[in-house]
From Swiss-Prot:
Catalytic activity: XTP + H2O = XMP + diphosphate + H(+); dITP + H2O = dIMP + diphosphate + H(+); ITP + H2O = IMP + diphosphate + H(+)
InterPro entries cross-referenced by the UniProt entry: dITP/XTP_pyrophosphatase, ITPase-like_fam, RdgB/HAM1
Residues at the active site: D68 (proton acceptor)
Protein name: dITP/XTP pyrophosphatase
Family, as annotated: Belongs to the HAM1 NTPase family.
Length: 201
């Protein structure tokens, strides 16, 4: 049995990651009350920041990884970007619900012809021997014209993001989403790496 620590407390991310990795004899542990300020200027910096913080907490003798992801919209100068999770407080200095955050994006995009956007996911892994590895996944698409929350398989900005097949990420099942999403792509690379390194050591 191999143990791997995930530097997050986001339940939605945990569920997606467990579904993607799905490696026999892998014990994925999520720390309780893990909270760290995301002060990095890029997704990579933030994912590494989380991984390093957890690595320190665990006395530098466990395999850990951190992940950072977000939505980048061309017409908004690639915002919300690294502020995706906290775009409400960044933009309006107040907390909004998920639907309200999605509506905020749609309001900012009102009458905007260029609706191109992409989701990005970055993973930073630190092994027991202090080797650092990085993995990234991107899905390109467009911002929808309206908010449709009839189906709610996803989370975050899934309900306003249209894939190349003109389907919202929120319309997909978890399995369907993980085959094409930024997180699915990044963690598939990470899974391959783990099987070749961690499980062959």
């Amino acid at each position: 049995m191999k143990t791997l620590f995930f530097a997050t407390t986001n339940e939605n991310k945990i569920n997606e990651v467990k579904n993607i990795l799905d490696i026999p004899n892998l014990n994925l542990i999520v720390p309780q009350n893990f909270n760290i300020k995301e002060t990095g200027k890029t997704f990579k910096e933030n994912s590494l920041l989380k991984a390093k913080a957890l690595f320190e907490i665990l006395n530098k003798n466990q395999n850990v990884f951190g992940e950072d992801s977000g939505l980048c919209i061309e017409a908004l100068n690639l915002e919300p970007g690294i502020y995706s999770k906290r775009y409400d407080t960044y933009k309006l200095c107040k907390k909004l619900s998920t639907n309200e955050k999605n509506q905020l994006i749609l309001d900012l995009m009102k009458n905007e012809k260029n609706r191109h956007a992409y989701f990005i996911c970055n993973i930073s892994y630190i092994s027991k021997n202090r080797q650092i590895s990085n993995f990234e996944g991107i899905i390109k698409g467009k911002i929808a014209l309206s908010l449709n929350d009839d189906k709610n398989h996803g989370f975050g900005y899934d309900s306003i993001f249209l894939t190349k097949n003109n389907k919202k990420l929120s319309d997909l099942t978890l399995e369907e989403k993980n085959k094409i999403s930024h997180r699915g792509i990044a963690f598939s690379k990470f899974k391959k790496f783990l099987l070749e390194s961690l499980f062959n050591s």
